[in-house]
């Protein structure tokens, strides 16, 4: 079996990690008396478990589809002979017998609660043991939290009064922001979901104000997000919401100061060690917090969510914010999607009665809902896009899978939506590069004028802001996004081609695109606490040897790992928004294409969206949803 897997590694179907994990299992079992087909099956499943995990699946359902398409070989006509060879080496054992065949094998456990092994079987699926353990820990946390806190510390009337203060607007239709705050007051674990502009951070700001009032401003609260960029956006949103409420609702000085206005990354909060799996804060040394707010939860993978849960005291109130319609985490798992799937169920009768008493809104109640439903609230009304917004309608059509209708919208909203059809890949690169040159011309002209007039970037212009800030605002008004990293239409090639085209137009001057040059935009790709730069931060080189991040300048020799940012991936854009977004899709079908990817790219745009894509590829992507295999939903179903 190893010889076949080695060939698949040479063909780059399997990674080095996939192959060497399988080899480890082979070495461990070499002196055992397992039958040869069983040994081969164990080696196969080790490679398969690793391969599936790196694709984002926390487990692999042992079904006929998996059996007939091992490692995706069924769709590779030149490599399909390897599939036949694999089945021969496991003695043509059918998939429904795989688990029984490995009963008692040293590398597998059928009872992961009581027995540890590298891999585990559960619910007819194959797991890495650590992935099963992470899912189990999350569900146990939710189960214990729901059971432990069934009594409210405050009366319905007290909660009602606070909600009326912070939601003075009278609405006939249900104000889901108000419902979300009431839900999170009652439950020490809550999830607030919603699309872009639905007011998740505004809602959580009101929630924190209510909680601090109820607890006499004594709560220790922290704000976190998965990336530095997302943390900055959370800070900005909280500050804006607080400023508005202080002005409109007479928030006291002490209450205002009781709400944190600084956010950190999850890695920073937990003290994650970059070289191993250890975190400073864990079950033995929990975070000393009363309330933790986590934004952009869709970006959090399974292992990180398990680490977070593990570091909380039982009495800490956890509030998760996110949009399950966006892309799931880069690494394995789709935690928010699994947790939020129960939002379509009605609330329990008990929760419905509580919401009626505290918010005045009547919601549907049921005896059959999953207990986690009472912890969830989904916000539906977008404040970013009005009812006549083309971007708003397009995002709605994409979310509903209306591929054909979505294309028609580009004709109905020509001022807001632009679709450029792509066919030939070479021509597509030229089209995208030409568009980038035109869109970046303005900020580079501003920078050139600054250079010619020998003006310090930190000097103030006529509007009272620094020239550095004005140039960055112009640069950030448009953002080019692409679906891929390695491809002619991928981020690496397009960044290079755009830089060369700008030099050809005499808008940039450099010898090598890898050099530091004035006008070069960069994106930080790893956190560096010493210089306070974080993954996702965007900077501009505005003077020799200096890069500006907002009003802060950093010497180029202190910049951590980074990459050019004329173009960035849609994945990296999560948590950001731009006045004009330009999105590029590949000209051929690619596994990365999905409805979630397109939705994420489209909803980065605030005022204008330009798309470069083949019409068939656009439709295919919208019809393709991400289906990551996980056992979290199955474990949650058993909460009843």
From Swiss-Prot:
Annotated EC: 5.6.2.3
Gene Ontology CC entries for this record: exodeoxyribonuclease V complex
GO molecular function annotation: 5'-3' DNA helicase activity; ATP binding; ATP hydrolysis activity; DNA binding; exodeoxyribonuclease V activity
GO biological process: double-strand break repair via homologous recombination
Record-listed ATP binding positions: 194-201
InterPro entries listed in its UniProt record: Coronavir_polyprotein_1ab, P-loop_NTPase, RecD, RecD_N, RecD_N_sf, UvrD-like_helicase_C
A Pfam family matched in the record: AAA_19
Keywords: ATP-binding, DNA damage, DNA repair, DNA-binding, Exonuclease, Helicase, Hydrolase, Isomerase, Nuclease, Nucleotide-binding
Tagged with keyword Nucleotide-binding: yes
Catalytic reactions on record: Couples ATP hydrolysis with the unwinding of duplex DNA at the replication fork by translocating in the 5'-3' direction. This creates two antiparallel DNA single strands (ssDNA). The leading ssDNA polymer is the template for DNA polymerase III holoenzyme which synthesizes a continuous strand; ATP + H2O = ADP + phosphate + H(+)
Top-level taxon of origin: Bacteria
Family per record: Belongs to the RecD family.
Note: In the RecBCD complex, RecB has a slow 3'-5' helicase, an exonuclease activity and loads RecA onto ssDNA, RecD has a fast 5'-3' helicase activity, while RecC stimulates the ATPase and processivity of the RecB helicase and contributes to recognition of the Chi site.
Protein's recorded name: RecBCD enzyme subunit RecD
Gene responsible for this protein: recD
């Amino acid at each position: 079996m190893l010889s076949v897997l080695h060939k698949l590694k040479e063909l780059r179907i399997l990674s080095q990690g996939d192959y060497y994990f399988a080899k480890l299992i082979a070495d461990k079992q070499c002196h055992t008396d397992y039958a040869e087909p069983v040994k081969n099956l164990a080696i196969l499943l080790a490679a398969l478990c690793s391969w599936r995990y790196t694709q984002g699946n926390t487990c692999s359902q042992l079904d006929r589809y998996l059996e007939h398409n091992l490692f995706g070989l069924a769709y590779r006509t030149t490599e399909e002979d390897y599939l036949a060879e694999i089945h021969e080496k496991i003695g043509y054992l059918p998939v429904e017998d795989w688990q029984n065949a490995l009963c008692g094998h040293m590398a597998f456990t059928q009872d992961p609660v009581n027995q540890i092994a590298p891999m585990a079987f559960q619910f007819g699926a194959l797991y890495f043991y650590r992935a099963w353990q992470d899912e189990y820990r999350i569900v146990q946390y939710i189960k214990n939290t729901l059971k432990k806190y069934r009594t409210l510390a405050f009366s319905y009337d007290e909660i009602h009064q606070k909600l009326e203060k912070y939601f003075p607007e009278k609405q006939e239709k249900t104000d889901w922001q108000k419902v979300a705050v009431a839900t999170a007051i009652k439950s020490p674990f809550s999830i607030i979901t919603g699309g872009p502009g639905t007011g998740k951070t505004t809602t959580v700001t009101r929630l924190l104000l209510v909680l601090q009032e109820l607890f006499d401003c004594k709560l220790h609260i922290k704000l976190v997000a998965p990336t530095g960029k997302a943390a900055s956006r959370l800070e900005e949103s909280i500050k804006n919401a607080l400023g508005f409420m202080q002005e409109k609702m007479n928030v006291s000085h002490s209450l205002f100061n009781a709400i944190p206005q600084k956010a950190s990354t999850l890695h920073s909060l937990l003290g994650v060690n970059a070289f191993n799996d250890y975190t400073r804060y864990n079950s033995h040394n929990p975070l000393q917090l009363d309330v933790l707010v986590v934004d952009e939860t869709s970006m959090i993978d399974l292992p990180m969510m398990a680490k977070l849960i593990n570091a909380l005291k039982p009495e800490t109130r956890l509030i998760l914010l996110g949009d399950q319609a966006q892309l799931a985490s880069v690494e394995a798992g789709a935690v928010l999607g699994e947790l939020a799937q129960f939002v379509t169920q009605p609330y329990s009768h008990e929760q419905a009665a509580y919401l009626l008493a505290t918010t005045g809104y009547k919601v549907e109640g049921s005896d059959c809902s999953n207990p986690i439903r009472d912890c969830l609230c989904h916000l539906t009304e977008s404040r970013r896009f009005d009812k006549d917004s083309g971007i708003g309608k397009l995002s709605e059509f994409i979310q509903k899978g209306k591929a054909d209708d979505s294309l028609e919208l580009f004709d109905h909203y020509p001022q807001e939506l632009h679709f450029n059809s792509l066919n030939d890949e070479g021509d597509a690169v030229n089209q995208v590069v030409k568009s980038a040159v035109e869109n970046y011309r303005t900020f580079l002209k501003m920078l050139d004028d600054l250079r010619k007039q020998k003006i310090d970037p930190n000097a103030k212009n006529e509007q009272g802001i620094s020239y550095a800030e004005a140039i960055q605002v112009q640069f950030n008004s448009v953002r080019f996004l692409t679906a891929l990293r390695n491809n002619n239409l991928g981020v690496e090639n397009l960044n290079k081609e755009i830089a060369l085209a700008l030099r050809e137009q005499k808008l940039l001057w450099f010898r090598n695109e890898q050099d530091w040059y004035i006008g070069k935009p960069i994106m930080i790709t790893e956190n560096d606490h010493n210089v306070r730069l974080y993954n996702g931060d965007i900077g501009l080189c505005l003077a020799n040897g200096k890069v500006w991040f907002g009003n802060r300048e950093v010497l180029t020799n202190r910049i951590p790992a980074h990459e050019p940012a004329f173009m960035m991936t849609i994945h990296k854009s999560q948590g950001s928004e731009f006045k004009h977004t330009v999105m590029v899709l590949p000209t051929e079908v690619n596994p990365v294409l999905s409805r979630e990817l397109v939705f994420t790219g489209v909803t980065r745009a605030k005022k204008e969206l330009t798309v470069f894509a083949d019409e068939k590829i656009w439709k295919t992507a919208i019809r393709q949803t991400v289906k990551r295999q996980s056992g979290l939903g199955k474990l949650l179903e058993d909460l009843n």
